[in-house]
Every structure is written in C-alpha cells, then in structure tokens.
Amino acid sequence: MSKIGINGFGRIGRLVLRAAVDKGASVVAVNDPFIDVNYMVYLFKFDSTHGRFKGTVSAEGGFLVVNGQKITVFSERDPANINWASAGAEYVVESTGVFTTTEKASTHLKGGAKKVVISAPSADAPMFVCGVNLDAYSPDMKVVSNASCTTNCLAPLAKVINDNFEIVEVLMTTVHATTATQKTVDGPSGKLWRDGRGACQNIIPASTGAAKAVGKVIPALNGKLTGMAFRVPTPNVSVVDLTVRLGKGASYDEIKAKVQEAANGPLKGILGYTDEEVVSTDFLSDTHSSVFEPKAGISLNDKFVKLISWYDNEFGYSNRVIDLIKYMQSKD
C-alpha cells in the first residue's frame, strides 16, 4: 500500500494511525507544530475513550516508533513547508480541521505529496463516502474529502432505502457526542452563542451540513434531505434519527430485511445491523460507518418511517479514511 502522512495529530489524526495499524497500512510521517514527539507517544499510548494502545510506541532519535516502525515527525505550521517526499509519504491525511478547501489542502502537494484526503467536509473538494460513491473517483483528482462522520453514517443507510423504496423527503437528527470544538464550561463562541455553552452540562441544539452533504454523494437525493444536531454530554458514539417519507410503500419488516441484506452483502463492514438491546457505549471502537438498529425505529404507516443508526463518530470514521486511501491507490 502507498505510504501515508498525517497532518494534525488530534483525535482523528491519532485514530487514523490506530486504524492504519489495524489494517496493515503504512504511516511514514506525522506533522503537528503543537506536539513534540514525546508528547505524541503519550497521547497515542493513552486514550480516555478507546483505551490504551495495544501495541508498542516510543520515541527514538526524533522518530515516533509504533510497533517497531519508524515514523518521521515534522513540526511545521505551514503545510507547504512539510517535506513529505523526504519521508516517502504519498497520500496525506489533512486532519487539522483548518485546511479544508482544495486551495489550502493543495499546499501539501508542494512538499511532495501525491494526493490529499481531507478528514472533514469540504466546500469545494470532491466528497466520497465508502460504500456509496467511490465509483465517482478519478485518478486525476489531487484533493478529496472523506465527508463527515455523520454523512458517513447517514449516506449508506439512505442509499439502501432510496435504492429499494425511493426517498421522497427526509429530516435527520443526529444526537452527537461532544467534540474538541466545544467548551468544557461556558465561554465565547463567535456568532453561534449556544455552541459556547458547557458541553458537560447541556444538550445543545446545533447545525449540521451532514444531511445536505448526502445530496453531493447521492445526487438523486439532492434537495430532499436536511437536518440538525443535538450535542449531548457523552464523550463518543452518536446516533442518527432518520425520518423518511417513502415513494414506494413498505412494511417495517420489509425495510429491515433490505437493510440487513445490504449489511451482509455489498455494504458489509460499512453498514452494520443489530437486533440487540443496545446503548451508545456498546459501539465504542466499532469500525462500521453506521449500525442500523431496527428495535429503536418506528413506522407510522407504509410510507412514513423513523430509522435509527448508531456510529462511533471517531473510530468508524477513521477507518473509512484508510479505506478511502486504499481505494484511491487501487485506481491511481
């Protein structure tokens, strides 16, 4: 597999490295101007949410060494100054959350990167969701986006429902775990005042572009979806509530059967299915993009249903970043 560089060693950057280790992918370089190599070792080894790293990690001669493999460490603020070529990094994961446009992310190419994958939604880069629209990828694309964790949960389920029952319109709510952008106690937050309220104390209504982004990866649904979020005081794992009006009438059992068929077939490993009496912590470190749970959903009639799907918004997403790179490499 092509060699990977990671820019930004935050929540997603570190978990992309864990996912790469699990999947046998080769990470050869990490850049973060705010964390030295010894602190990288500490942050990678210990994780309050996903637990201690099960392999070995150390700092040796300025390198980050994971399971015996040396990883070059850079500390550049400007992506244009990162010498990815010197470390052999070809595919760069842009996980700072800062350089999310094609223009900004393209600066990695100056340092020798061949392709850039933005681990966030992008205003102008082509967006891809594994299991949904990878066939739209073209080798001439230099910068792409892996969309958001919520879009990765929503899109595979929406694809199955639309392919089989025709979606007329959708309202989505994601009940979303806290993220690093939130405040531990009340503080200022620019234009969106309540986003600055204490994350541990509140259920906070928030905006999300995840539903509209589905229209970019499934063009047939463009303009048919929108949604919002509730940020809740849990550290990880979120859940999508999809309220759908169908074009073709179907019983709830028929919908369940089609989702299970997809989960066991073409979307295996991306879309999961469970009949268990689950709660959010049961999905910690789950590698699926989306796990459909029929017991939590309801049907009003054969054309109006509420569908529920869980996702580890950190680790499931990080696994898809590696899967996207693997797919790109197979086509480049």
Curated annotation (Swiss-Prot):
UniProt-listed PROSITE patterns: GAPDH (PS00071)
Biological processes per GO annotation: glucose metabolic process; glycolytic process
SUPFAM superfamilies: Glyceraldehyde-3-phosphate dehydrogenase-like, C-terminal domain, NAD(P)-binding Rossmann-fold domains
Keywords: Cytoplasm, Glycolysis, NAD, Oxidoreductase
A Pfam family it matches: Gp_dh_C
Subcellular localization, as worded in the UniProt entry: Cytoplasm
GO CC entries: cytoplasm; cytosol; microtubule cytoskeleton
GO molecular function, one term: NAD binding
The protein's Enzyme Commission number: 1.2.1.12
Family, per entry: Belongs to the glyceraldehyde-3-phosphate dehydrogenase family.
Listed name of the protein: Glyceraldehyde-3-phosphate dehydrogenase
Organism: Drosophila hydei (Fruit fly)
Taxonomic lineage from the root: Eukaryota, Metazoa, Ecdysozoa, Arthropoda, Hexapoda
Underlying gene: Gapdh1
